[in-house]
Regions:
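Class I SAM-dependent transferase core
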Residues: 1-37
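Conserved Class I SAM-dependent methyltransferase catalytic core
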Residues: 140-191, 195-197
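Conserved SAM/SAH cofactor-binding pocket of Class I
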Residues: 32-125, 148
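SAM/dcSAM-binding transferase cores
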Residues: 196-237
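General small-molecule cofactor/ligand-binding pocket signal
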Residues: 15, 66, 93, 184-187
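Mobile active-site "lid"/loop adjacent to the S-adenosyl-L-methionine
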Residues: 116-145
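A structural micro-motif
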Residues: 12, 40, 63, 90, ...
Length: 237
């Protein structure tokens, strides 16, 4: 087990398991992307150690925020991280999000968020341990599973926000629409201007009308290789 790491001086702090993924840009950017979506009740699907859960709790102290995580050690760590940052931890459920009907009430949330595994099970390099493997590939949760859970949990007109890889964007859109979630907002994340995107931030709306807003790309570095003003703002630098 590692000690606590602060995301920025005086900001949220996190403890993570040895061998798990370190604090990721993905969850930080998704939290910033989702923070402006109007919501009083939010749930994080596959919350892991709670980076996204804590960041949204920090950004939206007026909201009730819950999480579900299949791995008991990660769920316990999420509760610890929530408590360490002064937030209630009772809303973190240890369970399989594919069993959403047994775990939750339909239409209970205004906003569903997720930083899911990016790769199909068995593709690419296998992670060295189960925790990293579960965070990397879809052995416990496919895109279809995720979107089915999001549809069930999200109220009519509510939002589903996630981060994913650009090469799977068409799959994400198809899975969302199959489950009645219309893609409404898209933002590409690029390391620098002119580079191919390496992440996509997506918001869909349950029962939404067609029409997709494509936002300007989020650039991580400027022409000199320094953090952009937007990244510095996100990280409170």
């Amino acid at each position: 087990m590692t000690g606590f790491d602060e995301l920025w001086p005086g900001g949220p702090r996190f403890r993570q398991q040895e061998g798990s993924f370190r604090l990721s840009t993905d969850s930080v950017l998704l939290a910033a992307f989702a923070a402006d979506i109007r919501a009083k009740r939010i749930i994080d699907l596959g919350c892991g150690a709670g980076v996204l859960t804590v960041l949204l709790s920090h950004a939206r102290p007026d909201a009730v925020i819950r999480g579900v995580e299949i791995q008991p050690e990660s769920a316990a760590l999420c509760r610890e991280n929530m408590a360490a940052n002064g937030f209630g931890s009772d809303g973190i459920v240890t369970g399989d999000l594919r069993q959403y009907r047994e775990l939750f009430t339909a239409g209970e949330y205004d906003l569903v968020v997720s930083n899911p595994p990016y790769f199909t099970s068995g593709s690419g390099v296998t992670a060295p341990d189960d925790r990293r493997a579960a965070a990397r590939d879809e052995r416990f949760c496919t895109l279809e599973d995720l979107c089915a859970a999001a549809k069930y949990l999200c109220r009519w007109g509510g939002s589903f926000a996630l981060v994913h890889r650009p090469e799977r964007l068409s799959e994400v859109f198809c899975a969302m629409t199959r489950h009645g979630i219309e893609p409404k907002r898209l933002r590409m994340v690029q390391y620098k201007a002119g580079a191919a995107p390496n992440l996509v931030l997506i918001e869909g709306r349950r029962g939404g009308k067609s029409g997709l807003s494509i936002l300007p790309p989020l650039l991580l570095t400027d022409e000199n290789g320094a953090d952009t003003a937007e990244v510095r703002e996100i990280y409170h630098l």
